[in-house]
C-alpha cells in the first residue's frame, strides 16, 4: 500500500533528555532533515517529533522535562525545520502512539523483544531493580511511532537499525494476518550525513549518553565554553594535520567538524594546514563552530522568551499528526474487530 498523498513519508524524532542538542544531533540528523525539505519538496512529507514518551523510561523531573520538550522543539525550528513544509509535534500530544504500541505489543514475541541489544546493554548497566517494563517495550513504541504515519523512510543511525527491523517485522506480521494495513518502512541513510565524534574520545560518536560533557559541543552552550572544549580536544603526539580516521581520529574529527559547519571539503582543509600545527586547527575549528551555533542559540532564546510561536507550531503539528495517525488507528481497530464508538 502507499500513502494517499503521493509523497514518501518520513518520520524521525529526538528525545528531550538534555538541556541542549549537540553538534552531532545537528549535523548528523537535523540538518539532513532540513535539506530534504528544500532539495526534494515534492517528494517527501516529513513528520518530526519530540519523543517525550520515550524519555520517561528513566525518571525525569517534571519541570525539567517540560522545559526540555519546548527547547528541543525550538532547536528544530532554529536549525531550519520549516513547519510550513514539515509536521513538528510532541509525541504525547498524539494518543495514537500509545494506542498502537499496545496493539503491536500483542504481536511481539517476548523472546524477540528481549533480544533488543539496547535493552540488554541498558539493563546490564542499570540492574534488574532499576530496569522498567517501559524500557523493555521501548522498541515497540518506536515501531508504533513509525507505523502510525504510514512511514516509507526512517532516517536512522546504525545503532537504531535493529529497532527499525523490529518495526518492519511487526508490519509484515500484522499484514500477513490483516493484509494492506501497514506500510513497511525502509531505512533512509542521507548521502552526506556528517559523522561527529566525541572531542574527548574521538573513537566514540558524540552522544548525550557520554560519561563526560567535556567531549560534547552543545548548541546552546556559551560560546566561550565551546571554544574551551575544542581547544582541549584530544589529538595525538604527531604534528602533521592529515585526514586519517584510523590513525588520527582526533585530528580527523576536527577536520570533519570544521568541514561540516563551513561547507569546505576536508581535502581542501588539509591543504590549508600544510605547515601548520594543531593549535591553528583547533582555533579555526572553534571559530567556525561558534559562527555556526550563535544564530541557532539566538533563535532558540527568542522562541523561548515568548512561547506563543512555538506553541502554535506544536498545536498545528499535533492536529495534522493526529489526523494521519488517527486514520491508521481506525484501520487497525477495524481489522482487529474492535467495536466502533458511536455518537
From Swiss-Prot:
CDD domains attached to this UniProt entry: TrpRS_core
Gene Ontology, cellular component aspect: cytosol
Catalytic activity: tRNA(Trp) + L-tryptophan + ATP = L-tryptophyl-tRNA(Trp) + AMP + diphosphate + H(+)
GO terms for MF: ATP binding; tryptophan-tRNA ligase activity
EC id: 6.1.1.2
Family stated for the protein in its record: Belongs to the class-I aminoacyl-tRNA synthetase family.
Physiological role: Catalyzes the attachment of tryptophan to tRNA(Trp).
Subunit structure: Homodimer.
Name this polypeptide is given: Tryptophan--tRNA ligase
Species of provenance: Mycobacterium leprae (strain TN)
Amino acid at each position: 500500500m502507499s500513502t494517499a498523498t503521493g509523497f514518501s513519508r518520513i518520520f524521525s524524532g529526538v528525545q528531550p533528555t538534555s538541556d541542549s542538542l549537540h553538534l552531532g544531533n545537528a549535523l548528523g540528523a537535523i540538518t539532513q532533515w532540513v535539506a530534504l525539505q528544500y532539495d526534494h519538496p515534492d517528494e517527501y512529507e516529513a513528520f518530526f517529533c519530540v519523543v517525550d514518551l520515550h524519555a520517561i523510561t528513566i525518571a525525569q523531573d517534571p519541570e525539567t522535562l517540560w522545559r526540555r520538550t519546548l527547547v528541543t522543539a525550538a532547536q528544530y525550528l532554529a536549525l531550519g525545520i520549516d513547519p510550513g513544509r514539515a509536521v513538528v509535534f510532541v509525541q504525547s500530544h498524539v494518543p495514537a502512539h500509545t494506542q498502537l504500541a499496545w496493539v503491536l505489543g500483542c504481536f511481539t514475541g517476548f523472546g524477540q523483544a528481549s533480544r533488543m541489544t539496547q535493552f540488554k546493554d541498558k539493563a546490564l548497566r542499570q540492574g534488574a531493580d532499576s530496569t522498567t517494563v517501559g524500557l523493555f517495550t521501548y522498541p515497540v513504541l518506536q515501531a508504533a511511532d513509525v507505523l502510525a504515519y504510514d512511514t516509507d523512510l526512517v532516517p536512522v543511525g546504525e545503532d537504531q537499525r535493529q529497532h527499525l527491523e523490529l518495526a518492519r517485522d511487526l508490519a509484515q506480521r500484522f499484514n500477513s494476518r490483516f493484509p494492506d494495513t501497514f506500510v513497511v518502512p525502509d531505512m533512509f541513510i542521507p548521502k552526506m550525513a556528517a559523522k561527529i565524534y566525541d572531542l574527548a574520545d574521538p573513537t566514540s560518536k558524540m552522544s548525550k549518553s557520554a560519561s563526560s560533557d567535556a567531549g560534547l559541543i552543545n548548541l546552546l552552550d556559551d560560546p566561550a565554553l565551546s571554544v574551551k572544549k575544542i581547544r582541549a580536544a584530544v589529538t595525538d603526539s604527531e604534528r602533521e594535520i592529515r585526514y586519517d580516521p584510523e590513525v588520527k581520529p582526533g585530528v580527523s574529527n576536527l577536520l570533519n567538524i570544521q568541514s561540516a559547519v563551513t561547507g569546505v571539503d576536508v581535502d581542501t582543509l588539509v591543504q590549508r594546514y600544510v605547515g601548520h600545527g594543531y593549535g591553528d586547527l583547533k582555533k579555526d575549528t572553534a571559530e567556525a563552530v561558534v559562527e555556526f551555533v550563535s544564530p541557532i542559540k539566538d533563535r532558540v532564546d527568542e522562541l523561548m522568551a515568548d512561547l506563543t510561536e512555538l506553541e502554535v507550531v506544536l498545536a498545528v503539528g499535533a492536529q495534522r499528526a493526529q489526523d494521519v495517525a488517527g486514520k491508521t488507528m481506525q484501520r487497525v481497530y477495524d481489522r482487529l474487530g474492535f467495536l466502533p464508538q458511536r455518537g
